[in-house]
Amino acid sequence: MIKIGAHMPISKGFDRVPQDTVNIGGNSFQIFPHNARSWGAKLPSDEVATKFKREMKKNGIDWENAFCHSGYLINLASPKEDIWQKSVELLKKEVEICRKLGIRYLNIHPGSHLGTGEEEGIDRIVRGLNEVLNNTEGVVILLENVSQKGGNIGYKLEQLKKIRDLVDQKDRVAVTYDTCHGFDSGYDITKKEGVEALLNEIETLFGLERLKMIHLNDSKYPLGAAKDRHERIGSGFIGEEGFAVFFSFKEIQEVPWILETPGGNEEHAEDIKKVFEIIEKFGIEVD
């Protein structure tokens, strides 16, 4: 069974997310643990957490298919000490919010070194992750591949491996693969050889069991453009045929697919339908 969903709004409460996910045709989701554009975050109440867990069970959503995404302001690679410290403290709080809700995975962008260089940036990321992981429990941090721009660290999967190799609690660090970011950085998943190379790289660097989520996004710009502009499924440069190639791999089918495409719930429902239309149109076998 394909595990698919979208990044869902929390404006009406955490407890609305499971039902809203089912309403758009999904069985998986990603949420922000708080206002993504704020340094402020607070733990949900016991009542809110209980209601959320009840709705998860009621709507039949597996906890392995539920994810949080860290806030936009966090930058563990920042050379600015105040920003780095605030990032560490907010990430700790996000881990605690995940624990309270019962969510096992927290996705993060590794960060931007802001011109100070990859090595220094990775050192700061590792120090930040160690500070977070050594002072929290349970939740697994997912390192997401990012677009190659603005000093971003993680546009190459080997950069994510460098980070994970240096972290104390490696068992609490896994990965997310974003199709738009990867395409933006030269990973061509529109061809069978490209997907095979990607899977081989993930297996070699991390082990495929460490790939916990796929951010399923088309790209508004061509291969290697380094623009980081998501597009709706089938409407970008990956396109229907490209996604058909990607979807045909069993290793890809085993991982939850989370849409971060333009629009809200209505558009995400349409994109989920589009995914299944592509699967049917190209005769892709699904277990």
UniProtKB/Swiss-Prot annotation:
UniProt catalytic activity: Endonucleolytic cleavage to 5'-phosphooligonucleotide end-products
Required cofactor(s): Zn(2+)
Alphabetized InterPro entries for the sequence: AP_endonuc_2, AP_endonuc_F2_Zn_BS, Xyl_isomerase-like_sf, Xyl_isomerase-like_TIM-brl
Annotated positions binding Zn(2+) 3: H181, D228, H230
BP terms from Gene Ontology: base-excision repair
SMART domains: AP2Ec (SM00518)
Binding site for Zn(2+) 1: H69, H109, E144
Residues involved in Zn(2+) 2 binding: E144, D178, H215, E260
Pfam families found in the cross-reference section: AP_endonuc_2 (PF01261)
Keywords in alphabetical order: DNA damage, DNA repair, Endonuclease, Hydrolase, Metal-binding, Nuclease, Zinc
Sample GO molecular function, one term: DNA binding
UniProt remark on cofactor binding: Binds 3 Zn(2+) ions.
Catalytic activity, EC: 3.1.21.2
CDD domains registered for this protein in UniProt: AP2Ec
Similarity-based family: Belongs to the AP endonuclease 2 family.
Function, in words: Endonuclease IV plays a role in DNA repair. It cleaves phosphodiester bonds at apurinic or apyrimidinic (AP) sites, generating a 3'-hydroxyl group and a 5'-terminal sugar phosphate.
Name this protein carries in UniProt: Probable endonuclease 4
Species for this entry: Thermotoga sp. (strain RQ2)
Gene: nfo
